[in-house]
A protein has these predicted regions:
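Short glycine-dipeptide loop
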Residues: 138-144
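C-terminal alpha-helical "lid/dimerization" subdomain adjacent to the S-adenosyl-L-methionine
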Residues: 145-196
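Conserved class I S-adenosyl-L-methionine
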Residues: 1-42, 56, 152
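Class I S-adenosylmethionine-dependent transferase superfamily signal
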Residues: 61, 133-134
Length: 212
């Protein structure tokens, strides 16, 4: 998808202070510490991270050294950056697009789609393919968790609306049709139980028991 090309080596170097330190906290009004807590709450021993960005959240997830973790992204720069950061873990890096069948073997106990859905090509019915693809590689009791920035129907400030419009014009986001209700529907199509809440302009979710 178009937005992933923005993740250059230089951008990844400034990602944590710029995106997590400023945009997430100030523009989207969602505390980064809360997102770290959700990682710690939901992550399990056999974990798949789709769109790991810099590895910031995995680094803080409380996993013991040597824990096997699979990271998946279409951008090799992301995979390289996160792999270097997470050397204390047993990382398997997979270059792949979540909107296509995942080239993975075995099943996972948990998976994260953090900050990914608002970047995927819309509408939400099209993004549902990525959710279904992840659900297909989860164990029967597995959990998918993450967060996504809502479209204009979400609770936005003047500043966040300006940034939402700018990111969609540039093709970094594709979420003008993303609603909390719609997100709940695509999660519910692939999972039996869905928890969904809004913090600032972001929807935070956890979905368990993938449908077979």
């Amino acid at each position: 998808y178009r937005g992933q090309s923005e993740y250059t080596p230089f951008f990844l170097k400034i990602y944590d202070p710029l995106i997590l330190g400023f945009f997430t906290r100030v523009v989207w009004r969602c505390p980064t510490d809360l997102l770290v807590e959700r990682y710690r709450r939901h992550i399990r021993p056999r974990h798949l991270d789709v769109g790991p960005d810099t590895g910031y959240f995995l680094e803080r997830a409380g996993l013991p050294a040597g824990t096997p973790v699979t990271i998946l992204d279409p951008n090799v720069h992301v995979l390289d950056h996160a792999s270097r950061r997470l050397q204390r873990l047993d990382i398997t890096a997979v270059e792949a697009d979540a909107c296509k069948p995942l080239p993975l073997h075995g099943t996972f106990d948990s998976a994260a789609l953090h900050g990914v859905i608002h970047c995927l090509p819309g509408p939400l019915s099209r993004k549902a393919v990525a959710v279904a693809n992840v659900a297909a590689v989860l164990a029967p009791t597995g959990v998918l968790f993450g967060a996504s920035i809502l479209g204009p129907s979400g609770p936005h400030t003047w500043l966040s609306r300006k940034m939402l419009d700018a990111n969609n014009r540039r093709g970094i986001f594709d979420n003008l049709g993303d609603t909390q209700e719609g997100l709940g529907e695509i999660l519910g199509a692939s999972f039996e139980h869905v928890e969904l809440e809004t913090v600032g302009s972001m929807a935070i979710f956890a979905a368990t028991n993938p449908r077979t």
